[in-house]
C-alpha cells in the first residue's frame, strides 16, 4: 500500500464517505487511490468551493467535512474556507498535495508554504515528512478537528510520500480533552441565579455544536427564563417557547435587544459577544452580571468580562446550574 492509498484507507476508517475537491498534479496519487472505491468524490469548480462544501456537509451531517486540493494555487484557494471554518467552529480536514520533499524550499513549480499560510486559519497544520508518520497524522487530524472547540485542520502531503510504498500500521489516538468540572464557580453561578430578578439567557452557536440543545431546553423548562439567540444559535430554543424573544443584535428583534439592556443577569451559553450582537461593548447589557459558559477557555473574558466563567461541556454545566431549581 502506498501513501496515497493509505490516505483513502484512513478516510474510510474515520467513517468518511464523501469528500470535495479539485484535482491537480501534486495530489494526483490520492485521486488515483480514490478510484478504489468506498469514498465518493464530488468535483467542485474551485478549491474555495470545495472548502465551503465541506463546511456545509459538516453543518448538515454533524460529521467532519473533508476537502482536497493540489499544491500551490490549489492550496491557497482553500484559505478563505479554512478561515470561515475556524471562526464558525466547523470540523474540517483539508488534504493538500505538496511538491516532493527534496524540492521543498527550492521554489519549485506550484510550491507554496501552505503550512505557514494556514497557521492563522486552522486549529493545527501538519506537514507529512515521512511515510511512517502518515497513519499517526491522519488519525490526529480528525481528533483535533473534532475535539474541544471544533475547527479546521490541514494535512500537507508531499507527492513522493504519496507514491512511496511500505507496510504501515494503523494508528489509534484520542486527543485528551477532559476539563475539570468547575464546582466552585457553578455554586457561585447558582447563587447569582437565585438572587436575580430579571435573568436572561443569551444562546449562541456553541449549543448546537456541543449537541446540548436538549439540555438547554430542559434548563428553560425548569427556569421559565426569557431567552434570545444569535444567528448561529437559532433553532436551539423552540420558536413556540413562551418566553422566547427571537434573535439578538443588529438584525434582531426589538424585544430581545430591549430585554438584554434591562436584565440584571445575563447567562451567555456557547456565545462569544461578537460585534453584530453587542454593538458598543461598554453599553451592552449595562446592568447585568454575566455568567459565561463555553468549552473554549480562549473565549472567557475576551470581549466581555464575566463575573463567573464556566468552562466545560454544556451538557454537564446546564444541568448542574439547574439542579437547585429541581430540588
Swiss-Prot record:
InterPro entries: DHS-like_NAD/FAD-binding_dom, THDP-binding, Thiamin_PyroP_enz_cen_dom, Thiamin_PyroP_enz_TPP-bd_dom, TPP_enz. Pathway: Amino-acid biosynthesis; L-isoleucine biosynthesis; L-isoleucine from 2-oxobutanoate: step 1/4; Amino-acid biosynthesis; L-valine biosynthesis; L-valine from pyruvate: step 1/4. Keywords: Amino-acid biosynthesis, Branched-chain amino acid biosynthesis, FAD, Flavoprotein. FAD binds at residues 149, 251-272, 294-313. Disulfide bonds: none annotated. Its cofactor is FAD. CDD domains: TPP_PYR_POX_like. GO terms for biological process: isoleucine biosynthetic process; L-valine biosynthetic process. Binds 1 FAD per subunit. One of its GO terms (molecular function) is thiamine pyrophosphate binding. PANTHER family: ACETOLACTATE SYNTHASE, THIAMINE PYROPHOSPHATE ENZYMES. Belongs to the TPP enzyme family. Tetramer of two large (IlvG) and two small (IlvM) chains. E.coli contains genes for 3 AHAS isozymes: ilvBN, ilvGM and ilvIH. In strain K12 only the Val-inhibitable ilvBN and ilvIH are expressed; ilvGM has a frameshift that disturbs the ilvG reading frame. The ilv02096 mutation causes another frameshift which restores the open reading frame, permitting the expression of this isozyme and can be seen in entry (AC P0DP90). Restored IlvG is Val-resistant and is expressed in K12 strains having what used to be referred to as ilv0 mutations. N-terminal pseudogene fragment of this gene. If the reading frame is restored, catalyzes the first step in the biosynthesis of branched-chain amino acids. This is Putative acetolactate synthase isozyme 2 large subunit. It comes from Escherichia coli (strain K12). The gene is ilvG.
Amino acid at each position: 500500500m502506498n501513501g496515497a492509498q493509505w490516505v483513502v484507507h484512513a478516510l474510510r476508517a474515520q467513517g468518511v464517505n464523501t469528500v470535495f475537491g479539485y484535482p491537480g498534479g501534486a495530489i494526483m496519487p490520492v485521486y488515483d487511490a480514490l478510484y478504489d472505491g468506498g469514498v465518493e468524490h464530488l468535483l467542485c469548480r474551485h478549491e474555495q468551493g470545495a472548502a465551503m462544501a465541506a463546511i456545509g456537509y459538516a453543518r448538515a451531517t454533524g460529521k467532519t467535512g473533508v476537502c482536497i486540493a493540489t499544491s500551490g494555487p490549489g492550496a491557497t484557494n482553500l484559505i478563505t474556507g479554512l478561515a470561515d471554518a475556524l471562526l464558525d467552529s466547523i470540523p474540517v480536514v483539508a488534504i493538500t498535495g505538496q511538491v516532493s520533499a527534496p524540492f521543498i524550499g527550492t521554489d519549485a513549480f506550484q510550491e507554496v508554504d501552505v503550512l505557514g499560510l494556514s497557521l492563522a486559519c486552522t486549529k493545527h497544520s501538519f506537514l507529512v515528512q515521512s511515510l511512517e508518520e502518515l497513519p499517526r497524522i491522519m488519525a490526529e487530524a480528525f481528533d483535533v478537528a473534532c475535539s474541544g472547540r471544533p475547527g479546521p485542520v490541514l494535512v500537507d502531503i508531499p507527492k513522493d510520500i504519496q507514491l512511496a510504498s511500505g507496510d504501515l500500521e494503523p494508528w489509534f489516538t484520542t486527543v485528551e480533552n477532559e476539563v475539570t468540572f468547575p464546582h466552585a464557580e457553578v455554586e457561585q453561578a447558582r447563587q447569582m441565579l437565585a438572587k436575580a430578578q430579571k435573568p436572561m439567557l443569551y444562546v449562541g452557536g456553541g449549543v448546537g455544536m456541543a449537541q446540548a440543545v436538549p439540555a438547554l431546553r430542559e434548563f428553560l423548562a425548569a427556569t421559565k427564563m426569557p431567552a434570545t439567540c444569535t444567528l448561529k444559535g437559532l433553532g436551539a430554543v423552540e420558536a413556540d417557547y413562551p418566553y422566547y424573544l427571537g434573535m439578538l443584535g443588529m438584525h434582531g428583534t426589538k424585544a430581545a435587544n430591549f430585554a438584554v439592556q434591562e436584565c440584571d443577569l445575563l447567562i451567555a451559553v456557547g456565545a462569544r459577544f461578537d460585534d453584530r450582537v453587542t454593538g458598543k461593548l461598554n453599553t451592552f447589557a449595562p446592568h447585568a452580571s454575566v455568567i459565561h459558559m463555553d468549552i473554549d477557555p480562549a473565549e472567557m473574558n475576551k470581549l466581555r468580562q464575566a463575573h463567573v466563567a464556566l468552562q466545560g461541556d454544556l451538557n454537564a454545566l446546564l444541568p448542574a446550574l439547574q439542579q437547585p431549581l429541581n430540588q
